[in-house]
Amino acid sequence: MKKGMIIQGIKTKASVPVFVSTLFYVFLASFFIEGGLWLSSELVGPFSIAIGTLTEFFLPGNGVASIQEFFYHYILYYELFSFVFILLLFIFWVKVIEKNSLSTLGFVKKNWLKYLGWGISLSLLQMGVIALVYQLGGIGSFELNELSLEPILFILGLFPFWLLQGGTEEVATRGWLLTRIAARANLPLAIAISSSLFGILHLGNSGVTFLSVLNIVLDGVLAGLLLVYTDSIWLVVAQHGTWNYVQGNLLGFQVSGTGADASIFSFTMGSGPDWLTGGEFGAEGSIITTLVLLVSVVIVYLLGERNERAVE
């Protein structure tokens, strides 16, 4: 695959050695991601108090404590929304420091809605195959939960927040890191480094294994290829967000070692080894996911190569 318009449109300082600029890009991406997560964790307490106080002021009689309790009941919404801090850091850097346009992050208008639809469909297909293999192979089982209206609305309302969370991770590691490295170096190196950082960032998650990290890296490679193939961030935003949403809030899997607050299905893990079931990390720790991702990577790569031959 060749570099698209996103990468070609990036303004960089050619005077800085490629090795130095690559190290700087990796450091800055890590710093913005960890810094944004730290900021969101520091603000959760004051934010809940502020909401409780304002609500009590405008709607007296509810009680600050009860409002705060309500806030923590919906804490997953805040945790996902808080990724906006990371997104804003990258937008500020691109617009103010780099003086590049947001299109260099992949935010292009052309076909954006179509790519969102493709990304959602791709994740539904991938997770559908994984769930089917789990069920038919006796690796685990799914049971439909009896839910009232409130948890159903809770689950449905989470989808755009998962898109924000997953999309922000894609902007950080693919839209910014991959494209900046590729602008100075080559695409294989950019995809390898951005995917490796993506895997490293998950090392602290509960239940992490070698296979789970490998799958995260493979997913990063897939996302990198999709970004280059579409020359847009929108497909990988939708693919990543939907992947997490379907895992946790539809199928009841752990999402990279983190449990979902509510789900349409309850998942019961079988008695097989962790490399098969995924263990505490969830489906992303299973060899089944490895195979699905490998097939996806090969298909996208071949599609990209075919498109380039057609253009030539």
Predicted segments, located by residue:
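Membrane-embedded alpha-helical segments of multi-pass membrane proteins
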Residues: 80-88, 152-159, 172, 214-221, ...
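Membrane-interface helix/loop boundary segments of multi-pass membrane proteins
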Residues: 168-193, 225-232
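Membrane-interface helix caps and helix-loop-helix hairpins in membrane proteins
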Residues: 140-145, 201-210
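Small-polar-interrupted transmembrane alpha-helices in polytopic inner-membrane proteins
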Residues: 162, 187-203, 216-220
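Juxtamembrane helix-loop-helix connectors linking adjacent transmembrane helices
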Residues: 32, 36, 40-76, 98-168, ...
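Hydrophobic alpha-helical transmembrane segments
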Residues: 19-27, 77, 116-121, 152-156, ...
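N-terminal, membrane-interfacial amphipathic/helix-forming hydrophobic leader that caps
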Residues: 1-102, 248-312
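Transmembrane alpha-helical core residues of multi-pass small-molecule transporters
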Residues: 82, 122, 197-198, 215, ...
